[in-house]
Every structure is written in structure tokens, then in C-alpha cells.
Amino acid sequence: MTNRARRLSGNARRYWLALLACAAVALPTAALAQQVLIKFPHDLAPNTPKGLGADYFKKLVAERLPGRAAVEVYPSASLMDDQTSLEALAFGEIQMIAISVSKLESLTKRFQVFDLPFLFADMAQVEAFQNSAVGTRLLGELEGRGILGLAYWHNGMKHLTARKPLHVPADAKGLKFRIQDSDVLLEQIRAVGGNPQKMPFGEVYQALQTGAIDAQENTWSNIYASAFYEVQPYVTETDHGYIGYLVAVNPRFWRGLTADVRGVLEQALEETTAHVNSIARSVNDDARGRVLASGRTTLITLTPAEREQWRAAMRPVWDRFAGGIGPELLKAAGAAP
């Protein structure tokens, strides 16, 4: 190579290095930083309140933190089931969950308050408790276990579906009921003479279809989205309990975010929570209408006297679990002394 060629080669190299340096300076800091990835698995269909909430949160994050943060939603237990997600969150394998409050009793008995039958008369009472000082403090009680609660999302009030009509507690005697992994729900079904079976949500349809179980409890949105009405000819509208979710993150992940990114995520979650909880009733009402319009199940509406029989049969369950829940929570939830 001639001296002139060497000079040209050196000049070209310096030119490109200078150009790259200028480009790097021109890039915003966020573009050079690694994108924050939030893996968010859940166990329900996308058209349920939880599923709609996860997708709404994903949308807000994509709009407000493009290139800086992204949410990957895995519905219908496509990545893992609820119980597995608790451990995965604590170990930092995933970053966010919206888990049924019924499934937290292995970590603390305090969340059992949400499962007490006939404790909450309606969703307004649920919201009043969750928004109280006591309910807000409950969100943070699992941080030491790797689960930092940020919000409560509603599904709705529960009803009973079965292969036979259920008018009074005696009708439930001997029936195999699927329940969530909750000792409160176990005793609730035993209180009416049923045979409770703890089972993951994803296995329920087939178990109902094959007759492995005879009945289950759920909200209208879950009954519709999972097509339980196709294999359960009767729905008894009881409003006997609540299904809702703790939206939680891994605390180490959350505290490790930059303040500006965490602030945007907090605002997005606050707006998502308001959205989910405002649409939960309409989603359940719509699901109820679709189930009844299908003509595949019969609705049983309890008389006041029949409903009182269910309440009286299940009420003793409160006494069994009151000690673990604590008087402060029971009082805030509106439980009678």
C-alpha cells in the first residue's frame, strides 16, 4: 500500500469513528439502555376482567414507554398456572402477576378474609374494605416473601353451577365441588354437605364434562369464558362470595427500576385498576346474558328464605378462621362481632 493510500485509509477510519461517535451522542439515553421486560402470566381467558386488565396495562405501557419497557401477557395459563406463578415471581423469573386472593393463604392467613362466605353483601362493600387503611396495608404484607402487592382487581361475586338444581343446602349433599386452593372454601363446601375438590382452573371444564366433579363456584364471566355452562345444566345465583385478584410485582425488580420508568408504570397500573374495576360488573352482566341466551343452562333464583338457609349453613365457617385473619381485618370488612 502506498503512503497516499495509507493516509486515505486512516482518514476514512477516523471519519467513520467520528460519525459513529456523533450518532451515539445523538441517541437518547433510553435507546442505549436495556428495555425493561415485564412478563405477566395469568390463568384466565382474555375476555375476562383479569384478561382485559392485563391487555389494557400492556397497551398503556407500549404507548407511554416505547422502547423503554414492554409487557408480555401470557393468558389462560399458557406460561404457568397461578400457584407456579407465585414461586416464579418470588424468584424473579417473572415480574408481575394478578393472582386470586384465595391462593395466598399458604403465605398468610390474613387474605382468607376475602373467602369468608356471605361476608361481603356486594361489590360496594368489597371496594370499601379494599380502599380502607387496613385493606391498603394488606397489599404490602407479602413483600418479605418476594411478592409486593400494588392493587386489587375485581372479577365479581360467585354463584354455584351443578349437574342438578341447587335450591337449598341439602341439595348439595354428596356432590363433588371444584374449589380453588383455599381451606376456607374447603370448609364452606363441607358446611353444606358437599365434597370439595381442590383443582387448577385449567382442569375444571374437562372434569365437569367427564363427571369427575359435579359442581363448582364462579363468577358469570368465568362461567361464560370457560364455557362451564355447556357442561353444567344449572346455575344458582347466590352471590355467596367474592373473586378478586392481587396485582403484585417482584419487589427487587420494582425497586430496581429508574424512578421515571417506575412512575410511569405506577400511573399506568392505577389507570388500569380503575378501568378493570369499572368494567367488571358490565363484563359479568354481559356474560350472564350470553349464558342464559344459549339455552344450555337453567337459572335458579333463590327466594329470600332459601338464600338465608345457605347463609346460615356457611356462617359457622367464619369462626373457624377468624383467629388467623385477625379482628382488625374482620371489623374493617364489616363482619359482625
Regions found by a protein language model. Give the residues of each.
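Bacterial N-terminal signal peptides that target proteins for export
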Residues: 2-19
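N-terminal secretory/targeting leader peptides
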Residues: 18, 22, 34-125, 133-337
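Sec/Tat signal peptide C-region and signal peptidase I cleavage site
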Residues: 27-33
